[in-house]
Swiss-Prot record:
Residues 36-425, 440-522, 543-756, 878-978, 1080-1214, 1226-1264, 1345-1399, 1456-1498, 1513-1547, 1598-1625, 1661-1723 are annotated as: Disordered. Residues 1553-1588 form the EF-hand domain. The gene is hbx5-1. Residues 746-755 have a biased composition (Pro residues). This is Homeobox protein 5. It is found in: Nucleus. Its main location: nucleus. Keywords: Coiled coil, Developmental protein, DNA-binding, Homeobox, Nucleus, Transcription, Transcription regulation. PROSITE patterns: EF_HAND_2 (PS50222), HOMEOBOX_2 (PS50071). Residues 51-72, 223-237, 244-257, 351-369, 483-510, 632-655, 673-685, 929-945, 1147-1159, 1176-1187, 1226-1242, 1529-1543, 1665-1675 have a biased composition (Polar residues). Residues 1543-1607 bind DNA. GO terms for molecular function: calcium ion binding; DNA binding. One of its GO terms (biological process) is regulation of gene expression.
Amino acid sequence: METIVNNQNNGQQNTVPTQSFSSSVYMNYDFFDSQQLQQPQHQPQHYQQQDSFVSPNLDNNNPQIHVQSNNYNQNGFVGYNNSNNNNNNNQHMNNQYSNSFHNNNSSGFMAFQNNSSNFNNQNNNNSNNNNNNNNINSYDYNNSNNNNYNNNNNTHSNNSNNNNNNNNSNYWNNNNNNNNNNNNNNNNNNNNNNNNNNNNNSNNNNNNNNNNNHHHHHHQQQSQPTSPYNNPIQHNPNDMKFNGQHNPFNGNQMVMDNNNNNNNNNNSNVFNSNSNSNVFNSNSGSFLQINNNNGSFSSYNNNNNNNNNNNSNSNNNNNNNNNNNNNNNNNNNNNNNNNNNNNSNNNNNNQFSQSYDSTLGNNRFSSMMGQPIQQQQSPPQQQQQQSFIQSSPQAIPASNCNGNGSTSSSTSPLSPTLIGSAPGTPTSMLATTLFGFNLSSSPTSSPSSPVKKGKSQSALALSSSGGSGGSSGRKKPQKHDSMSSITNTNLKSTQASTLKESKRSNSSPNLKKQMQLQQLQQQQKLNENGTLIPPLPFASISENITNNNNNNNNNNNNNNNNNNNNNITNNPLSGSMEFPNSNNINQSSDSINGEFNIGQPESPKMYNSSPSPPPNATSTTKGGKKSKKSLHISTTQQSPSLNGSTGGSMLTPTMSGLSLSGGGSGGGFSPLISPTGTTSNKDLQSSPSPSPLLKSMSMGKLDLQDSIDSMSSPLSPNSSLSSSNGLLPPPPNSNNMNSSGGIPTPSTPTSPPPLTHHINIFSNLEFVKQLKDHLLPNDFKPEEHALERNLLRFQQFVKTLAEPLQRDVVTSMFELSVDAQLQYGSNLDNDNLSALMLFRRKILNFNLFRMMMLNDPNSFIPLPSPFPIQTTTISSNGTIVNPTNVNNNNINNNNNNNNNNNNNNNNNNNNNNNNNNNNTTTTTTTTTSANTVQSGTTSNSNLVFQQTSNSNTLSPSQQQQQQTQQQQSINGSSTGSLSDAQYQDLGIHLDTSSANSGCGINVSIGSSIGGGGGGSSLNGSNLNGSSSISGSISGGSSNGGGQFIMSPQFSLDGAYQQQQPSSYNINNEMELAEKDEDEIFNNNNKDNNNNNNNNNNNNNNNNNNNNNNNNNNNNNNSSSINSNINNVNNCNINNNSNSNNGSINSPRPSTPTTLNSSGKRSKKIYRGDSFGAGNDISTGLMASSDQIIPPPQQQQHQQLVNNNNNNMNNSENNILLADSNKGLSVSLGSLPTNTPSSMEIEQQQQQQQQQQQQQQQQHLNQQQILHQQLHHHLSSSLGGAQFTNIQQQQQQQSGNIFYNSPYNSSQVYMNPYGTSITNTSLAGPSTTSSAMQHMITNMTSSNIIVNNQNNNNNDQNNNNNNNNNNNSTTNSNVNNNNNTTNTPSSPPQPNNCTPTQTSIITSNGVVVPSLQMRGTITNPPPVLPTPDTLVLQQQQQQQQQQQQQQQQQQQQQQQQQQQQQQETPHTPTSNSISSPRSSPVHQQSPSNTNTTTTSTTTIRHSAVTQLSFAGLHNQQVSPISPRSPRSPHGTSGDYNDGSQSPSSRRKNRFTDFQIKRMNDCFENLDKNNNGKFTSEEICQIATELGLTDQQVRVFFQNKRARSRPSPRGQPTNPLTSSTNNGNNSNLALQHLQQQHLQQVQQQQQQLLQLQQQQQQQQQQLHQQSANTTPQLNSMNPNSINYNNNNNNNNNNNNNNNNNNNNNNNNNNNNNNIINNNITTINE
């Protein structure tokens, strides 16, 4: 397991960057060995790929990390995420983290079995410590830190403590510092650093540097960490016993530390976010890796980076992380402090990337990983880092192209898998990560431009290509030649400097050898595993994650510098990322090179046609000497010729749309797109015209070779693609694809022919057709589809191929990615990045990917429609249940907001922080901790598709790129039933071993910018993310888990609705129709909230970043609510909210409604309802007020919330939920190209800071009140958990629910929505109250959007009045959502909604029915009640009254009929039996519908009984009162059983219907001359009529006895009495029967008419309230959350940190976390 210690900024001042570590965890315990733990301290960064990770035996008295790598090796990370979620619920990150470990332990994934308990204990301790800290208000910060240290002598505990502290905001900073220290194994130092960092960044940096450089060395306290009150924390050296054995955890190896950091972030919502987003990042970024746990860890690293970014560590953290990575904390800190500037930020980013690279060093797919980049360092640091680079298997960091002139390597563990292609480039992702094996040789190695000296440099840049160092005679690569060169090159910097460093530096021979050896080891490992394609993440995913990480770093840097968005852009475009071990590949196998006809000549001319200046060359410093070596591309390394004579790629230039070198004529690839269309090759001049799609995209002219003929030409004799060779799979059918999730595996020939350079895989038209059929839907729209889904299918398809073809495909994809990289780099202009630029690049990249599958790339490319992917919920038993596609609509827009919050904390950093927040949020979302929830609730294994949208921080192009990535993010879950291996291949972890996790499917694909778990790039338009739809539903950072985050372009059902659904602004509040408890709403709205929950984590991070804000928050959170606050923060209750800490602030005073003891609401919960402090929440359900708040102006309100500090046009940028038959679909609105200028941001920040200072005193006062209330409530519980309400003496009443077990080692904040139910303690889970158990078992809708309210509370506390107002409105929306979520019963459904019954299988096997509402979602009204809603209520009440009146009338009519029958001269035979068991079969339920229910049987009936049954079903009888008047003369008269005298015999009462049926049966029996009914017939009749066999038998006996006097052959009228004989009586009775039937028919018609009228009325009402009552496709209440509220929460946090805009973002983060928690409960 590798850990990257990422510094998280606890910066108390924006100007003062502080170090905090948000550790990104690559739980790659597979690669840890006990030897690694025992490595000397001077070699903490030296990694060896190991199969197992064994921690040294540590003294339990001195808590230390006990790791058993074996556990982690499996799905430990996923389980880890799950655990994180639980822990988040129990306690923030720590609890989640511990839970993650705990789950892992239960799953056997977790290396920390001892620590899992310890970790849980630690988490509990952390929680307790946090609680103590909170209670102590950071007095016990030292204690908590000590506890954390003690716990974390597993760095994790420290992290959790840090997170708790982060939650405290004061503690956040301190704790984050501690976490960082723990990560560095210098907890004290980190504390000092954080405290100092907040105060003195340089000192912190130094400490961090020391820690980073001497992670293992600095276990001892170099400086005493100070509490928030600057009280030195006294640590017992024994308590903080971090031995060299722990060194692996520290430094790059500190995977656990990173995780802890992430946990901290998540704990403070960041860690959960991180863990969630990490999980998702790993899933999204390294889906396959997650399966391997390597990817998961890589994802963690990315997430961790994001977490750091999110933690407002984003700025400082990025710096710190970078510092840790670079071991140049001082410089980084200085850069951060000074730079929140582009250079320092870029450096930090590079460093940050480096830290990822180092973490990846232990990954099994280290070749796919990037090594840390060295910056200018002291010789000892350089030597240490160099040693690490040499030892680590990773060789590929990707450097981001920062406009600041500094390059930041954005390679995340996932991103290294990307081959120097733009993060959005799908092909590069496919080339590197799509397939599990590394190419022994790459067709081309894109020259990654190294950063200038002092900048981070990619490890691959260090490694040279096969050629010798001589660069003479070689033409320097041009600007457009490689994305990496552009990304690494500061476009603003002079071209002279660019030309001066255009050559790539060659790494030392030892490094090359080591890399080659590592590659061989990797390959060997893969071979041993029996798979050539290990489940690595898709490059796109990994890139997105990497980009997100980079973005986080960039965002952090941008936050620091504002980074000109160049960092962000560079990160998403991290074209500098080279193909993993490209040098190794180039040199690894000559035989393979020969196969592919790929060579590495000394000095080939590259891109000789490129007019742009060459990229900067990478230079590495070793031993004080600088060796420069340019990348050499072999002249033999050419794209396959068109005629097929030469080629190493399945792609022809035409197919790929690339302008490849002329057939064997030499020369490298030409730029993919040339604005001027000039090329040096004559062949290119005659290339066909670009495709119409490219023309429409204004992408420029493609230089294509005329290779159309070659594509259709037959295969050469040497071709390995003959139809009979078995290499191609049989044409799959839709059934196979749907059922197996992939194409059937073809039979592999026993001896496949060797792959030759003549092969052109696409020359086989059959194969091309198959690719088209599987990968090219007919109706594709780039803005409405996620590319990753095609990539996933493509991966599945390729995996069915034989190895030669697989390698061929990989080679071709690599070529495509390299060319695409050049294209990206060619048109890059950091100064003029348009919003459409990145979007077009993404589209171009995808189109190129598809063009390779076309016979004629110039032909019109049909836009494929997204193939429906049915989202599935996988229960704990592994069964796949079709879940409501609820969570899918969650978009990572809020994540962007989270990043914004972090950025705000650091500096003005509004944009940068936003990016960071996005990363953090993404991370939170990624964690599917819901699966680990130990409650009885089922955890929906929802795929989280987080889409990070960096709004302000990102340039418009970056925002668009994020949106594109989000759109491309995988939306659905796996289709059909897949095997475990297949799920793992998809990056889906089925944590069936965990008690609760129905499915630990973490599938979020982070957008490249959003970073960490899908990033929040989706809604980049709004800084606040308020308009953005939180992409992460997955249990918000702390609680979230297992949430679906759906790409906005996809409907919840996974199918795209062709109709443009009516747009709905997620940010706008949605008014939900009243829902009964049984109804489960779609998670779509809630998903936004989940994103907001992620933002909550960011808020915690924000607290850490901005000490001032944190202090304010701490004052609010820590002093009064400290313990609760931590829990609250974990629950996504806003830490930042002043005195609202952990409490839910309602936008307005509300009349609370209480919940009855059964947990059902006595009153409806409406949109806009707020949860008052006095609400009865003992059942775990949030009460809501009866009052409906009239909606304010939705657009205006949202815009106010979003625009508080967002300079984005929210109305334009709002993500719209569209109505579709399949469910809600989310579409992105246009993104504004404008970003606020730095001056505007500074002004806003100044204004916000002033406002914050004014609010601080109020917050303190509120905290005191809350603190008293908390002690009162917390002291009230003994042993068991209790819910307590916290009343805030504030304009807004907020109710906090704390699930406290004072005797447990950890206090668990129980999300009122039941986000986390298990309470971990040393002794084990604490008992839960009956109300809690009820909520756990019954509340599928447990996900209440109280989080949004929390966000609102935070907003009010932190944000300006305007923002607060907006936030309040948003909160109301959240409340509505919460109400909707809470309601377990199904309310009357709108007429236009078609309810579909689905079932959710809980972890205990109970099937819970859930309704899916399918209808249109219209723009929800704002919070305030509207006359329409009031009218709707009144109308509904009137309808109910009318129904009651109708029922009464029906009863009266029935009574009248009975009286008429009684008055008739002829009475029916008084032998009708009526038993107490009699149940009216067709009796209508008096309350609800007027439809009658019939009980049918499937038993075959005899001819005798079939008539009666036919009459029963064909004839609808009006409902009859169960008890008609007893009259010996009535139709339902009493029948004597004949056993007793008339006076004493018991009377059985039959209904008229029963009597009539039995008489009919008796008459039919007589007609058929049957002597008696058989026992079977009697049983059938009794079953039909709801009677017992005895009753029916006695009835017939009595009937037979009375009918004996009449001739046997003469049928007796069943209704005639034995005393009344004669035709007259029979005729009279028949007449009465006819009248009765007529009356019944009339009544039925009346009922139908009434029903129709009611339906019409409902439709009218629904139309009237169409704007106010959105109808969610799926009723999973968890998912229903509103991003608006979350945005508001983020705003509050940002206000605490910087400006209101940032606060809004922070608030959004808080909401996301809560949503995640909610999702976790539901799941």
